[in-house]
Amino acid sequence: MASIPPDDDAAAAAAAGAAENGYGNGKGNGNGPAPRPPPAKRPRSVISAAQIRAEFEHHEAGVARVNNGSFGCCPSSLLDAQARWQRLFIAQPDDFYFHALQPGLRRSRAAVAGLVNAGDVAEVSLVDNATTAAAIVLQHAAWSFAEGRFSRGDAVLMLHYAYGAVKKSIHAYVARAGATVVEVPLPFPVASADAIIAEFRAALDVAKAGGRKVRLAVIDHITSMPSVVIPVKELVAICREEGVDKVFIDAAHSIGQVPVDVRDIGADFYTSNLHKWFFCPPAVAFLHTRKDDPIASQLHHPVVSHEYGNGLPMESGWIGTRDYSAQLVVPESIDFVNRFEGGIEGIRSRNHEKVIEMGKMLAEAWGTFLGTPPELCGSMVMVGLPGCLGVESDDDVMRMRTMLRKDFMVEVPIYYNSRRVEAQEMAKDKNGDAVTGYVRISHQVYNVTEDYEKLRDAVNKLVADGFTSSKLRPSQKQETMA
C-alpha cells in the first residue's frame, strides 16, 4: 500500500499523529484542531554557505538573479522530496489516490495552519497560486450579485497597484456581475504608511457615496509592482469600522517576507503563495477562511470535481488528475527553513537588511533613491533608475529588461511610473531628471553582493554610453511591417 514518503522518522510520526487527530484518515473531511507543524530536522549546525550554494546549484550559472519575487526558488532537497511524491503516484496511482494523497495534503494543511496561526486546520485550503484563491473569493461575490444578495451598483474596493491578474479577475467576475469597482490611488514613491491609510480612507468614502454598500475590499499585503508593504491590519480595522462586508487580503508575496498571523490581521480571506518566499516548488498557495464565517461553506473551487460540495479544502484537494506534489512538500519546506539560524524569521530579517543595503548601494551609484522607506519593504525594494535612461512606457521597460537579461545576464523586473498623484511632483535624480523607471530587486538566501554589483555596473555602462530607451524602440517602418 502507498504511504507518505517521509524523509525521516519525525516526519512519519507527524503524519501518523495527523491520522490519530482525525485529519489523516483515508479521504475524510480533514477537520479538527490545528496541530503543530511536523517536527523539523535538527542538524548539528546551521546550514553553511557551501551547503546553500549546493542547494541552488541548479540555478543558471553566471546570471545575477535578483528577481526572486516573480517565481521564487526551490532548493535541491525540496525538489528531491517532490520527486519522491511524483514517483509514488506514477508507481501505483490508484493506491496513491485512495490512501496517500489526502493524508499528505492534510499534513501540509496542518503545517500551514501552524505557520500562520490559523484556528483550525479546516480553515486552510491548498490551491495552485494566489490568483486561484482570488478567483474562489471573487466567484462567490459574482454569484452574490447574480442571485440578488448584492444589489447592482454595490461597490468592490481595490488598490490601484493590485496585481494585474487580480484586477482583471475583479472586472471579469464582479464588475461584469454588476459591481462598481473603486480604486485606491496610492502615491509612488511612498513616504509613509500614514499616506497609504489616508488614501484608503478617501477612496472608501468614494465607494460609500450615496449610501452605496461596499461588499468587498481587496487589499494587497505586499504589492507586486511597485513593491510596497501595505499596513493591512490597520486597513482591515478601517473596513470593520466603516461597515465593509468582507475583506480579502491578497498576500501573494507575504509568507517568508513579513510575519503573518491571520487571526491578528483579522481579514475574512487571506492567501499567500508558498513557492515565492517559502521555498516550495511551484506551484502552491493557501487560502485561509474563518471557520465561524457562514460564507466559508459557500466558497467553491472554480474547477468543479467529484469533491464539489464537500468543503473547499476537499474541493481544492482534488480537481482531477494532475501533479499534486508541490502541495505535498510543505512540511519539508519547514524542515529546510529550520536549517537556518532563526528559521524563517531569521531568513526574513537577514533578507530585509541585505536588500535595503543593496538598494541603498544602487541608489547612491545611480544618484537616485529608494521608492519606499525601509519599514515599507520586505525582501524586495524599488530603486530609481537614472532619469537619463528615458523610460517612457511599459514597452520601454520590457525591452530594457530583455536587454539586461541577454546582454548583461542580469534578471531584474523594471517598473514604469506613469501616474502622478494630484499635487505630487515626479521625483528627480541628482541631475534633476525625472525618475520614471525603477528596478525591483529581491534578496533571497542564494544571493551574493556580486549579483547587485553586476546590475549596478550594467546600468552605469548604459549611462556612460549615452543609452536611452528610445534606442530599443522599433522604427516606424518596422511597426508598419508588423
UniProtKB/Swiss-Prot annotation:
EC number assigned by the record? 4.4.1.28
Domain of life assignment: Eukaryota
- Positions carrying N6-(pyridoxal phosphate)lysine are K276
* Required cofactor(s): pyridoxal 5'-phosphate
Composition-biased stretches (Acidic residues): 1-10
Quick one: where's region Disordered?
A: 1-45
Q: Quickly give the catalysed reaction.
A: L-cysteine + H2O = hydrogen sulfide + pyruvate + NH4(+) + H(+)
List the Gene3D superfamilies.
Answer: Type I PLP-dependent aspartate aminotransferase-like (Major domain) (3.40.640.10)
Q: Which UniProt keywords apply?
A: Lyase, Pyridoxal phosphate
Q: Where is the composition biased (Low complexity)?
A: 11-22
Top-level class of the enzyme under EC nomenclature? lyase
GO MF, one annotated term? L-cysteine desulfhydrase activity
Q: What does this protein do?
A: Catalyzes the production of hydrogen sulfide (H2S) from cysteine.
- Similarity section: Belongs to the class-V pyridoxal-phosphate-dependent aminotransferase family.
Q: What is this protein called?
A: Putative L-cysteine desulfhydrase 1
